[in-house]
Amino acid sequence: RIFDADEGHLLRAACAIECVHTYSLIHDDLPCMDDDDLRRGRPTLHRAFDEATALLAGDALQTFAFEALADPATHPDPQMRCLLITGLAKASGAVGMVAGQVADMAGQEIGSDLIAVTRMNRLKTGALINFSVDAGAFIGCASEAEKTALSRYAHDVGLAFQMVDDILDAEGAVRDTGKAVGKDKDRGKANFVTVLGVEATRERVGMLAAQAKRHLALFGPRARVLLDAVDFVVQRRH
């Protein structure tokens, strides 16, 4: 929207990203991963149905995401569609989200290494957030300076989002979060709170939020929706 890009193109790209995001949550909740019973205040898919259904639903969402991006309705330029497909594949695959999930599953081995925890979360959570912003920049034909500013914004928002998630896991309530809390501590998994503590993590969230907003100065009032997104990330309780 900053670049007055076609709303239909943006929404189709956003839907593809959300399909990948939702597939990742379905698989993350499986017994072989985090083994969670609750998601968004409702039973997880494998609890509501069964593991096979959950696995296949996740697979279907993942493949549908790329089917949607490949459709000319997403963008008339085939090179743009290829750019979006490649970007989402990298963000969600072996050098992005999946790599982060592998590190998360080995959480006990990470221990108190802040650099390792940061890298894990930049991949597991941040990669998809980064691509969400990159996709808008691609479709909007942003300049190199604008792409750089947006990439830095997404980096900071992604880390802040995960830090808030870790704070909610440490001191949130199930009625607010819609999912189990205290999981990482119970399982001995490393996160920002287990490494830094709640207050130090909260301070870093504030620093990252302020920094993310500064990256948007280039866009002036056009960046209102992205500024609001920073506030949402910081203030969310779910």
Q: What feature does the model see in each segment?
A:
Residues 1-164, 170-213, 221-234:
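Mg2+-dependent prenyl diphosphate-binding active-site environment of isoprenoid biosynthetic enzymes
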